[in-house]
Amino acid sequence: MKVPYGLNAGKVFCFHRARLEYVISRRTLLALPFAAACTRPQESFRGYAFIANQEGGALAAVDLGVLAVARHIPLDGAPSQVIAAAQHPLVYALTPETGSVHEIQIDTLRLSRKLGVASQAITMELSADERSLYVLAREPRALISVALDSFKVDWKLPLPDEPVGLAVSPDGRTAAVSSARAVHLVDLPARRLSAPLGQGEYGPIQFHAEGKTLLAGNRGERLLSVYSVAAQRLITHLPISVRPDQFCLSRDRGQLFVTGAGMDAVVVVYPYDTPQVGDTVLAGHAPGAMDVSKDLLFVASPQSGDVSILSIATRKVIAIVPVGSDPGFIRVTPDDQYALILNRKSGDVAILSVPAITKNKNRYKTAALLTVIPVGSRPVSAAVRAV
């Protein structure tokens, strides 16, 4: 196949399935028990994956040491997001329709505290020191700070528009809030909202370069906008070939991967120094959720029920793995042992072995998919925590 040129977003690479290093077919699902027994690492990851079951109204705690559900933790509401603290044995779940935050103890796998912060919420982020939890609320339109020691609302900052996305800088001093009309910075110590950095239909936002720059996806104009945080001004607009719906940074933060409507591709952006679009790599069908290991990029294709795996170094697709029905979220464990794929329609989590993909030593090409674990109704978010 010829390689098309001339796209605004840079080079486009096309790959035939026959040219992939390996493609795992759906019939490998029948071989999962054998494959898992032969390929599971001798030392399993010691920890849990906490999975938010949106329609089940619960968190499923999956013991990653034995690859089985340890407990279902019922919640009052439909969870959409779960975050694990690194410094404390705690996990936080958000139920947007009730505007509530739920705290779960990792050692007991039980709900410990619950706090209603708004009538409706959208998303949440932990502060770097894990002393505060910031909740972005739809009703009322506000950024809300929760003090985690007392588990009470510390302050609320009203917002001019219905918010969409939230990001918190690594130093914990600045937040960014996007909306369908603009993107703003928030001085967290002063509890002050900046003037709009830019006008447009913004979606995902991400701090970069130790919080010195802000990357903002303008979905209305298919732009990646880069702003200076200190100067509160635009650095550049980068036209891209997809609507910027999802962001994912490489571990070294040297590459930003973008997926969204408009093209079956992943756009690769180099955000350091002079930000520029690098490559546009064809991958999957209507690609969506992403996550990375040190060397690999995992990209979910909800419509086709598979995950495309790319080498970050070469930006080539090296595998396509069928995982289930409607994969919509990916989380790689901190030790790069497992990639967890949440399948919303089939209500399960597919566990991929990252070393099996990286080393490519399995002659039958079935080692990557270790097992599929039923976890509940419509799993949509996961957080992994070592113990």
Regions found by a protein language model. Name each.
Residues M1-I24:
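Secretory targeting signals
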